[in-house]
Amino acid sequence: MTSKRGIKIDVKNLNFWYGNYHALKDITFPVYENKITAIIGPSGCGKTTLLRCFNRMHDLYEGARYEGEAILYPDEINLIGKNVDPLLVRMRIGMVFQKPNPFPKSIYENVAYGLKLRGIKKKSILDEKVEKALRDAALWDEVKDRLHENAYSLSGGQQQRLCIARAIAVEPEVLLMDEPTSALDPISTAKIEDLIVELKKKVTIIIVTHNMQQAARVSDFTAFMYMGELIEFGPTEKIFTKPEKKLTEDYITGRFG
């Protein structure tokens, strides 16, 4: 379920401060359901800061302050509202980080961990959901005979797909991805990109990437940020071929970055 306009998260006048530092300034854009939205921009522009607002990661640090709205549909809760429990937000919005970060547990236990936290204890149900998540993460065929081996025995690309399986096992409504392929080789990167495109059938995805070719390949919409401000947002094809702002064009054509 979304709003009438197919929006999953409606971001309006979002501002964010680290202490006295005004990191994000009046950010407004829609995140469309079952689409991939890429956030691009030079280092330090606020991409990851914005991404981490959506699941309240900043709440872990003292002095973090939000203003504005990030309305999650269908129930229209403000994800950054002071009265909204960040733990409940994180149950609905999953995250995959830059470097693979599997738990020091078996492959199976990595995927089952979140399910158990949510009270699922029956082995047959856990088995079914673990297999489904690993299949959805395009990893099942590679690990089905070694589920009880340590996750660290997997390659880097496999570990990242395991982290994706772990995130999607609990069926989040939105999946945040912070440069999910930056630590991977080109073959592993291609597998993850194919996987991301496949996953959007089931989950809304927001991806931060330094790799503009990646943004062009996988995303439906692109947000270009510069110095804490959203410069331009629109369909990816338009942003990359006919941007409205000169700053966007300069960044995309490599004049700065």
From Swiss-Prot:
Compartment annotation: Cell inner membrane
Any Pfam family the entry gives: ABC_tran
Keywords: ATP-binding, Cell inner membrane, Cell membrane, Membrane, Nucleotide-binding, Phosphate transport, Translocase, Transport
Domain ABC transporter: 9-252
Tagged with keyword DNA damage: no
Superkingdom per UniProt: Bacteria
PROSITE patterns the UniProt entry points to: ABC_TRANSPORTER_1, ABC_TRANSPORTER_2, PSTB
Record SMART domains: AAA
Catalytic activity: phosphate(out) + ATP + H2O = ADP + 2 phosphate(in) + H(+)
Annotated binding of ATP, by residue: G41, P42, S43, G44, C45, G46, K47, T48
EC number: 7.3.2.1
Gene3D superfamilies according to UniProt: P-loop containing nucleotide triphosphate hydrolases
BP GO annotations: phosphate ion transmembrane transport
Role: Part of the ABC transporter complex PstSACB involved in phosphate import. Responsible for energy coupling to the transport system.
Assembly and oligomerization: The complex is composed of two ATP-binding proteins (PstB), two transmembrane proteins (PstC and PstA) and a solute-binding protein (PstS).
Name of the featured protein: Phosphate import ATP-binding protein PstB
Gene designation: pstB
